[in-house]
């Protein structure tokens, strides 16, 4: 089954329902992670006069990661210059404490400051300050959460990154770029025809995607900052499933210009494609490994869609998935340890994950219409689209499936998520 056929199936299943579009979400966290660090994030002094509640955003980020549990801070009135009474916070059950302030500057910007404390050891773990315009208050909060996450887990936080996704209302399709929590969504492109397969470039400056605006699937790249588009692949037949190489110089794409759907590599600026494999089967949905040496892809060469692997320059093909008769939509974690994919189980499409070193396979959702998994750049969460309780939703999940966050709001056709890379600060 080709990428285009797969995508059209999901469009008919969900995008044909005609719900109103939604551009922002609220975060609803459910489930229990295996290990959660108790942290108190006190209300920031002065944040009542700001348009964003910094402490609430920080706490929501940390809880959504599955590694933190919020501790009640009711009655606390502290800021980053105050040394807290550690005994009080230990009694409340906190292992760490974040304090801060928000001050309006004379030029209209906001000065956001914070400090992190190790309550158990009584140690100052450092802090930062940000002078930001009003529109960047949420970004400042996400960066605070990144700092806290890295200090307490040793892994880089991904809260200040972005996601891309597609919505449909009536006959209007929109490509959106939003914060990793779904807020602050901005429309990047609108079309009366379907938009599918958004894929972030490695440096986060561009999105590749497929548009049907010319009544056939065509691959474009889109500059996120200025909105400029470049036509990449408009060959005879279908052009679909763009995937960036780690160096950003090449796109792997699926083309049917020579007959069946086959894998090609094409310069990221456009040009003549180079065929990667010779096969009479349908090969589609390529994705590069983080080192750029291999490509995972979907093929029906064994009779039904399964995930395979081959060298990125072409060569011998190796089958990867064996559990289940129908496996599609591969996504590789940035650390190279995990493969997420969608498996059809008794007619239901469920998110699965493979630990590549051991080959261990786990189903991590109990929903039945999952699609388009994409890893956070720190490899600790997966974003995907699904239906839950009859509603279309974007979800994030921990890799063990123990804690999920529904990025929910109004009903809407919200699809095709892709998680962007770390941003330069």
Language model features with spans:
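Residue-level detector of Asp-centered blade-edge/turn motifs that repeat once per structural unit
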Residues: 157-159, 202-203, 246-247, 290-291, ...
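Amphipathic beta-strand/beta-sheet edge segments enriched in Tyr/Trp
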Residues: 25, 82-147
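Structural motif
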Residues: 109-111, 171-176, 216-220, 260-264, ...
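Hydrophobic beta-strand positions that form the internal "hydrophobic ladder"
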Residues: 163, 207, 248-252, 292-295, ...
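Short beta-strand->alpha-helix linker/helix-N-cap micro-motif
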Residues: 28-88, 98, 102
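Multi-bladed beta-propeller domains
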Residues: 179-196, 222-240, 266-282, 310-326, ...
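Short loop/turn segments immediately following the C-termini of beta-strands
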Residues: 168, 212, 256, 300, ...
């Amino acid at each position: 089954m080709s990428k285009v056929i797969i995508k059209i199936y999901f469009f008919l299943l969900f995008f044909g329902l005609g719900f109103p579009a939604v551009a922002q979400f609220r975060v609803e966290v459910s489930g229990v992670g295996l290990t959660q660090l108790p942290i108190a994030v006190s209300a920031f002094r002065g944040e009542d006069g700001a348009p964003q509640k910094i402490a609430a955003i920080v706490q929501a980020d940390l809880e959504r990661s599955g590694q933190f549990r919020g501790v009640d801070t009711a009655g606390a009135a502290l800021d980053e210059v105050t040394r807290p009474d550690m005994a009080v916070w230990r009694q409340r059950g906190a292992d760490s404490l974040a304090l801060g302030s928000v001050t309006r500057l004379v030029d209209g910007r906001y000065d956001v400051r914070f400090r992190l404390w190790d309550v158990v050891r009584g140690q100052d773990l450092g802090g930062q300050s940000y002078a930001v315009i009003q529109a960047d208050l949420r970004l400042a909060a996400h960066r605070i959460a990144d700092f806290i996450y890295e200090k307490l887990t040793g892994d880089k936080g991904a809260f200040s990154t972005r996601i891309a996704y597609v919505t449909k209302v009536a006959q209007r399709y929109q490509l959106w770029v939003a914060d990793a929590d779904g807020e602050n969504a901005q429309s990047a492109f609108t079309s009366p025809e379907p938009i599918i397969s958004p894929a972030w470039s490695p440096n986060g400056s561009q999105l590749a995607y497929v548009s049907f605006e010319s009544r056939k699937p065509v691959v474009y790249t889109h500059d996120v900052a200025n909105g400029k588009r470049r036509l990449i692949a408009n060959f005879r037949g279908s052009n679909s499933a763009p995937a960036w190489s780690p160096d950003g110089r090449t796109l792997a794409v699926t083309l049917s210009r020579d007959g069946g759907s086959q894998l090609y590599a094409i310069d990221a600026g456009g040009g003549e494609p180079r065929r990667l494999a010779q096969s009479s089967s349908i090969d589609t949905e390529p994705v590069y490994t983080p080192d750029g040496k291999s490509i995972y892809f979907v093929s029906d060469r064994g009779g039904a869609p399964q995930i395979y692997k081959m060298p990125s320059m072409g060569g011998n093909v190796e089958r990867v998935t064996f559990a289940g008769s129908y496996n599609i939509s591969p996504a590789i974690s940035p650390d190279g340890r995990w493969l997420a994919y969608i498996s059809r189980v008794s007619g239901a499409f469920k998110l699965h994950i493979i630990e590549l070193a051991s080959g261990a396979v786990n189903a991590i959702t109990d929903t039945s219409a999952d699609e388009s998994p994409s890893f956070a750049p720190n490899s600790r969460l997966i974003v995907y689209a699904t239906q839950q309780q009859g509603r279309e939703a974007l979800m994030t999940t921990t890799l063990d499936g123990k804690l999920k966050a529904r990025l929910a709001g109004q009903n809407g056709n919200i699809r095709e998520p892709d998680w962007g890379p770390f941003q330069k600060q």
